[in-house]
Amino acid sequence: MNNDYKWETVGRCKFYTDGTTCTDIEVMDDTKEISFIYPKIMIDREKCKKVFSSVEIMLIGRNAISIVIPNKMLPNIKHVESKSSSFINGKYLIERAGGKLLNVFGQSEDAEIDFTLFNRIGSYAFEGCRATKVSDSEDTGFIRINNNAFFGSGFMNQPFVNGIKCVGSLVVDVDETADEVIMPKTGIQYFPDKFVKCMRLP
């Protein structure tokens, strides 16, 4: 273990950090806000299974340049307030450069995801998100998507329709057992990297 790392308290939260990079977080019960003041927040998605469901506001300090956290860690974030030039204010965690969605957080089952707010989607950005609707399906067709962007999300839990699962105009999954897959006529973006035995365009 790196001896330069130690636990530091910021508000009602504790951060395991060397002053530059934070690799672990603890949050006191009933805490509503979390402040990211360190340049880098790097929480390993594979190792960290912590969930801080009471936190609703994320405050980002001006020195923050990189935030990597599991989407399921802070499921109930409702507002991101950023003093950093690297991130924007809003209801999702979005990098300013390139408009990349990092975390959409939990969202309710009846929430509509606003795809007009970002141009790219990072890996696992939707993991644990319960939403299954988009606010305007036409705005999903020109978005660059990283691998596993919708992994573990409500969108992926939906049943196949004509052998596919769609998020707006994005085809995000294909039924590999289907004898025939029918793609929409227009305005689609094919995302999953799967072999399809038979595909028909109406």
Predicted features, each with a name:
Residues 1-123, 127-147, 151-168, 172-202:
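Structural signature of tandem-repeat unit edges
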